[in-house]
Amino acid sequence: MPNPLYRQHIISISDLSREQLECLLQTALKLKAHPRGDLLEGKLIGSCFFEPSTRTRLSFETAVQRLGGKVIGFSDGANTSAKKGETLADTARIISGYTDAIIQRHPKDGAARVAAEFSRVPVINAGDGTNQHPSQTLLDLVTIYETQGRLDKLKIAMAGDLKYGRTVHSLCQALKRWNCEFAFVSPPSLAMPDYITEELDEAGCRYRILGSLEEAAEWADILYMTRVQRERFDEQEFAKIQGKFNLEASMLARAKPNLRVLHPLPRVDEIHPDVDATPHAYYFEQATNGVYARMAILSLVLNEEV
């Protein structure tokens, strides 16, 4: 079967078909079970991070090196010609002349699509503002499949900052293709955006609003936690919600045995350390899967056959 991702930009989950997502998922699982060190041999990848990152940057660079490729780039846009006023379009033009693919993170929504428009090589979006984070979504899909044995018709609860969290937006857009059911737990001011719930409606996916993490843990197959950012509230408002969206081990007492708790990390207070010792915690394994997910993306984008 032809590789449906060869020479493709990876910008948004919405751009990818279910067939392409399944190809990425199965390739990630295959590379995890049977690693290969030759798929990027002779390839040079540009790692262009205009804002700080730990897991995403390091796991992408690990993926490149494990596949036999090499990396050039930067980890902070302040030390590039962007600081002098160079446009993103020009940066993409220049770096695409040096490399076989560009991995880009940028603070502005839509920046990845701008880079793709002017790049001569595939652009992989490593996060653009509050918009999209497709490689995170792929590692989430790998983790969900790994823990549940399927993606079809799962119950997915999402908690915390659902308004600004690009990870939960992208994950909803991916899992709607498998007819999953969703539940949302958040402060009213950080509710899931209308455009996401409208997409779920159009796909025929059911969703509900729940009032507590205990309810979510009892209902769900996957509980996807995110951080409620203190800086988005005044002190009085934050005091009202503080702790309400922080998960503790005692809240998992009525959870189904197959429930797994995921988090894009870094966590602060929203998952208590006592959850780490429960059989439901899976966020560190989730982070490890980032390497295999990104190996799959790079392998498929840069090889006709994998």
Swiss-Prot record:
Binding site for L-aspartate: 84, 166, 227
Superkingdom of origin: Bacteria
One GO MF term attached to the UniProt entry: amino acid binding
Any Gene Ontology biological process: amino acid metabolic process
Reaction catalysed by this enzyme: carbamoyl phosphate + L-aspartate = N-carbamoyl-L-aspartate + phosphate + H(+)
Keyword Magnesium carried by entry: no
Cellular component per GO, a single term: cytosol
Protein's UniProt keywords contain Transferase: yes
Pathway: Pyrimidine metabolism; UMP biosynthesis via de novo pathway; (S)-dihydroorotate from bicarbonate: step 2/3
Entries under SUPFAM superfamilies matching the protein: Aspartate/ornithine carbamoyltransferase
InterPro entries, sorted: Asp/Orn_carbamoyltranf_P-bd, Asp/Orn_carbamoylTrfase, Asp/Orn_carbamoylTrfase_sf, Asp_carbamoyltransf, Asp_carbamoyltransf_Asp/Orn-bd
PROSITE patterns: CARBAMOYLTRANSFERASE (PS00097)
Gene3D superfamilies: Aspartate/ornithine carbamoyltransferase
Positions contributing to carbamoyl phosphate binding: 55-56, 105, 133, 136, 265-266
EC number, UniProt record: 2.1.3.2
Any matching Pfam family: OTCace
Keywords: Pyrimidine biosynthesis, Transferase
Subunit details: Heterododecamer (2C3:3R2) of six catalytic PyrB chains organized as two trimers (C3), and six regulatory PyrI chains organized as three dimers (R2).
Function: Catalyzes the condensation of carbamoyl phosphate and aspartate to form carbamoyl aspartate and inorganic phosphate, the committed step in the de novo pyrimidine nucleotide biosynthesis pathway.
Family per similarity comment: Belongs to the aspartate/ornithine carbamoyltransferase superfamily. ATCase family.
Protein name: Aspartate carbamoyltransferase catalytic subunit
Organism: Neisseria meningitidis serogroup A / serotype 4A (strain DSM 15465 / Z2491)
